């Protein structure tokens, strides 16, 4: 069976620097930082004071009050981004076979805030007072479930939970679903809403988070002074569509998805493998599927978390996968502006790749000033780049050794 071609026809985003794609992208282009003091809880006893929170989000702008009350933030963000993406794609569900429209939207964590609130209620008021909707509000698959309900999409509906690689795996699996004829349209991406006392404390004690109190120097991927990531939240969603289906309805085509690689490190629960071989194989697999050579890759949106291990080992992976071409490719980290959106990161970064292809614009890695000796690639330090982007790659690496890579190209 020959694989069908898959294109991107819609984009949606809720982020710390903009609650829709236009606002988000304009912020990214100007290097706006979405990091600030945590407002969700009192951080007096916490080493970490900063996070990248979504601002001025009102769920009632996207759904009725009753629906909003039945969802936690991660589901609300997913529904908001998915509705934007579908409106952008111009898909009218009443004209589609709903069983040929699917959803794969993942969350790495689900709702920690719901669990924390329920635990407090259990301790203070007893088991009979725990919210009866706790379970359907907190479990991670409810992002996909709520998107399906909100849009009337009745095809394949799943979620992938691979920590910080969730969003990229979701888009990759949606790509496969269309390639092999399981759907005509897929709504895919990632979402997260885990800025909470337990979440921040857990990541802090893991020594994963930056303890800097300077928003402009807290998330500094590839910098020699990097000290961890800044936790963020939001959602990023793309509408993928079978090419002929998109052409038949006169859709605007942003880009084509041409490669997907997924591997495991089989090494450690939090650290990538030191030689970068797992991520390198995922990149190589994506290029092999697309039939492109390393020197054809114009841009890599790196996982680039700002932790010591990730940035060093990901650099090694890029060098292993691209060889001499690694020195020429433009590499950046969107996390320098919006922090690490965990399961949503890959979804939002896929949106960045598509916009970079569309506009020929590669944003800078904001805040990063000076790298160490082994980090000797072009990390887009000091300013953005305007150039044609024919091929863009997006890397995501998750706790547990999960690696996911998407390769997109300019549609012709």
Predicted regions and their residues:
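ACP-dependent fatty acid/polyketide chain-elongation machinery
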Residues: 1-67, 244-256, 351-365, 409-412
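Condensing-enzyme catalytic core mediating Claisen C-C bond formation in acyl metabolism
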Residues: 5-9, 36, 214-290, 299
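Conserved beta-ketoacyl condensing-enzyme motif
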Residues: 8, 24-25, 29-162, 191-200, ...
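A glycine- and small-aliphatic-rich helix-loop capping segment at beta-alpha/alpha-beta transitions
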Residues: 22-27, 113-127, 177-180, 200-213, ...
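Active-site-proximal alpha-helical scaffold in enzymes
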Residues: 78-91, 140-144, 148-192, 230-251, ...
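Phosphate/pyrophosphate-binding loops at sites that engage ATP/ADP/AMP, CoA/4′-phosphopantetheine
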Residues: 85-97, 246-250, 283-299, 321-325
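Glycine-/small-residue-rich "gating" segment that lines the acyl/pantetheine channel
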Residues: 124-131, 169-172, 176, 192-248, ...
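Acyl-CoA/ACP chain-elongation machinery
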Residues: 182-227, 260-274, 304-311, 328-378
């Amino acid at each position: 069976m020959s694989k069908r071609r898959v294109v991107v026809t819609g984009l949606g985003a809720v982020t710390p620097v903009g609650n829709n794609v236009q606002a988000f992208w304009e912020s990214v282009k100007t290097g706006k930082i979405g990091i600030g003091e945590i407002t969700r809880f009192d951080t007096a006893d916490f080493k970490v004071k900063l996070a990248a929170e979504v601002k001025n989000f009102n769920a009632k702008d996207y759904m009725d009050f009753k629906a909003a009350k039945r969802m936690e933030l991660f589901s609300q963000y997913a529904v908001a981004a998915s509705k934007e993406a579908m409106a952008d794609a111009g898909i009218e569900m009443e004209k589609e076979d709903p069983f040929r429209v699917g959803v794969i939207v993942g969350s790495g964590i689900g709702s920690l805030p719901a669990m924390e609130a329920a635990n407090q209620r259990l301790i203070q008021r007893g088991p009979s007072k725990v919210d009866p909707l706790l379970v359907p509000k907190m479990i991670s698959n409810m992002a996909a479930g709520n998107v399906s309900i909100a849009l009337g999409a009745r095809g394949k509906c799943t979620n992938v939970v691979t920590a910080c690689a969730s969003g990229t795996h979701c888009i990759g699996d949606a790509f496969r679903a269309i390639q092999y004829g399981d759907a005509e349209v897929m709504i895919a991406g990632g979402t997260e809403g885990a800025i909470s006392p337990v979440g921040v404390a857990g990541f802090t004690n893991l020594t994963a988070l930056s303890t800097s109190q300077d928003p402009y120097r807290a998330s500094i991927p590839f910098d020699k002074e990097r000290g961890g990531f800044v936790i963020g939240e939001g959602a990023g969603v793309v509408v993928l569509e079978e090419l002929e289906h998109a052409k038949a309805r006169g859709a605007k085509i942003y880009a084509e998805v041409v490669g997907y690689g997924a591997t495991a490190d089989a090494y450690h629960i939090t650290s990538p493998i030191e030689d970068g071989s797992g991520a390198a194989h995922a990149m190589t697999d994506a290029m092999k599927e697309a039939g492109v050579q390393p020197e054809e890759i114009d841009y890599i949106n790196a996982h680039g978390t700002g932790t010591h291990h990730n940035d060093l080992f990901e650099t090694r992976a890029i060098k292993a996968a691209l060889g001499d071409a690694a020195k020429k490719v433009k590499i950046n980290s969107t996390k320098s502006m919006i922090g690490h959106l965990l399961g949503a990161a890959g979804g939002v970064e896929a949106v960045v790749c598509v916009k970079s292809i569309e506009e020929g614009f590669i944003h800078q890695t904001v805040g990063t000033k000076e790298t160490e000796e082994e980090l000797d690639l072009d990390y887009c330090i000091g300013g953005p780049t305007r150039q044609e982007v024919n091929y863009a790659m997006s890397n995501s690496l998750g706790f547990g050794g999960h690696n996911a890579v998407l390769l997109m190209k300019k549609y012709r």
